[in-house]
Design a protein with these regions (language model features):
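Beta-rich carbohydrate-recognition and catalytic domains
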Residues: 9-64, 76-140, 145-193, 209-214, ...
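Beta-propeller and closely related beta-sheet repeat lectin domains
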Residues: 1-8, 69-73, 140-143, 201-207
Length: 255
C-alpha cells in the first residue's frame, strides 16, 4: 500500500515519491515504511498511450525511511530539492538532494546535542530527529514556497486542525519562525446532504492554480458517521477535494 508523496520533473520524466504504508499491525495502522520512486513518461499529450506511462518503479528506493521525507518538496534555485517529512506527525524535518534529480544522493538536516545543525548522508536515528525539527510551532503537512528573499511555510494546525499557519525563514531548511494564523477552514461543506464532517486532512498547496499571486489550497474530509461515506445523499462529496483561494496572504505580517 502506498500513500502519494510529492513529485518533480527531471529530463522530461515525472519522478513521484510514494510513501510505503504498513497495515499488518491492527494496533498501529498506516505506519510509514520506506519510499518507492516511480518514474513516468511525459512524451506526447494527455490521452496518448505514451503519456504518463510507467517507466520504472523502484520499490526499495529508500527502505530506511520512516519519517516521510518528500511528502512535500521545494525545488530551490540553489540546485537542491528540499524534502519535508515529520517525526511524531508534528515535528517537521528536512532532507535535500544533491541535484534537481530525486535519484541523486540525499542528505539529512540534523541537530547535534548542542543544537548545531549540519547535513549528513546517513539516515537519522530517532534521537537525532527528536532534536531536529525546523519549525517553532506544532503543525503538519508543510508546504514551502519562496517570494522575494523569504521562504514561507504553510501548514495545518495539529489534530486535523481547521486552521492554517504561516511561518517564514531566510532558508528553505529553516528555522521557520514567526508563526501566524493564516486562515480558518469552514465547519460546513458546500455539498448535498450532511454538511458537517469529522476530519480535515490532506491540505495541499497548488501554486500552478494561482492566477494573481494568491494561494490555492485543497482539502479532503470524511464523514462523522462512517456509513455516510458510501450510502447517503452527497456521500461522494466528503472525500472529493474542496478548493480555497487566499488573497493578500503576505499582509498577515503587516498586522
Amino acid at each position: 500500500l502506498y500513500w502519494a508523496g510529492d513529485a518533480t520533473v527531471c529530463n522530461n520524466q515525472l519522478q513521484v515519491l510514494w510513501n510505503g504504508v504498513d497495515n499488518t499491525n491492527q494496533q498501529a495502522l498506516m505506519r510509514h515504511e520506506g519510499i518507492c520512486l516511480a518514474t513516468y513518461s511525459l512524451e506526447g499529450n494527455p490521452g496518448d498511450d505514451s503519456y504518463m506511462k510507467l517507466i520504472n518503479a523502484d520499490h526499495h528506493f529508500n527502505d530506511a525511511d520512516i519519517y516521510g521525507y518528500g511528502s512535500t518538496l521545494w525545488e530551490d534555485e540553489d540546485g537542491h530539492i528540499y524534502l519535508y517529512g515529520s517525526y511524531n506527525n508534528y515535528d517537521m524535518l528536512v532532507a535535500r538532494t544533491a541535484r534537481h534529480d530525486l535519484t541523486s544522493p540525499w542528505e539529512y538536516y540534523v541537530s547535534d546535542e548542542q543544537g548545531n545543525f549540519s547535513w549528513q548522508t546517513t539516515y537519522p536515528t530517532e534521537q537525532e530527529v527528536k532534536r531536529s525539527r525546523i519549525q517553532d510551532t506544532d503543525c503538519s503537512m508543510p508546504w514551502v514556497i519562496k517570494k522575494g528573499d523569504t521562504y514561507y511555510m504553510f501548514a495545518q494546525a495539529k489534530w486535523f486542525g481547521r486552521e492554517m499557519y504561516i511561518f517564514r525563514s531566510d532558508k528553505p531548511y529553516g528555522p521557520f519562525v514567526d508563526c501566524k494564523r493564516l486562515f480558518g477552514l469552514p465547519d460546513l461543506l458546500d455539498k448535498l446532504g450532511e454538511r458537517t464532517y469529522k476530519n480535515l486532512y490532506m491540505v495541499n498547496l497548488h501554486p500552478h492554480l494561482s492566477r494573481n499571486g494568491e494561494l490555492v489550497f485543497s482539502t479532503n474530509t470524511d464523514a462523522k458517521d462512517f456509513g455516510d461515506n458510501f450510502n447517503a445523499v452527497g456521500s461522494a462529496d466528503f472525500y472529493r477535494p474542496y478548493f480555497y483561494r487566499v488573497y493578500n496572504w503576505e499582509k498577515v505580517y503587516d498586522e
